[in-house]
Amino acid sequence: MPAESTFDIVSDFDRQELINAVDQARREVATRYDLKDTKTEIVLSEKELTITTESEMHLTAVRDLIQTRALRRNLSIKIFKFGPIQEVSGGRVRQVALLQRGIPEDVAKKLAKLIRDHFPKVQPRIQGDVLRVGSKSRDELQAVIRLVKEHQDEFAIPLQFTNYR
């Protein structure tokens, strides 16, 4: 048995599920009566999602549609960080949503402090965009997972637990 057990806290999403959710939203926009003739464009790139349409009302409807499709595919809507609505040429509007992947350093520090405050014998270590938590006791690690799940609403990113060893 290893001397120390560890697990990683990560913030990630299944890209293929996001692609499927966006494709479903595109199909629904093309067939839905109120959105059919709005020339709505939904562009998914590696790090962002761009929605361009005719009015703010249509933009809000498309954004809600994408979020609903993402939720149905077990993706957290916290992966979308929507920017401001911008006016573009032709009276159209655009909104860019950054796709959040990885734990930002400030969130990792807050998580590490939360863990250290409740479990002094547990060692959280920030490793890039992953927070590795180690302890000699597996029971303490399971208690840390419960603690982080209870406080997950305080963080603006979705958290998953991987590599439990």
From Swiss-Prot:
InterPro entries in UniProt: DUF520, UPF0234-like_C, UPF0234_N, YajQ-like_sf
PANTHER family documented for this protein: UPF0234 PROTEIN YAJQ
CDD domains per the UniProt record, alphabetical: YajQ_like
Record HAMAP family: YajQ
Domain of life: Bacteria
SUPFAM superfamilies per the UniProt record, alphabetical: YajQ-like
Protein name (database record): Nucleotide-binding protein RoseRS_0530
Origin species: Roseiflexus sp. (strain RS-1)
Function: Nucleotide-binding protein.
Keyword Cytoplasm: no
Similarity comment text for this entry: Belongs to the YajQ family.
GO molecular function: nucleotide binding
Record keywords, A-Z: Nucleotide-binding
Any GO CC annotation of this UniProt entry: cytosol
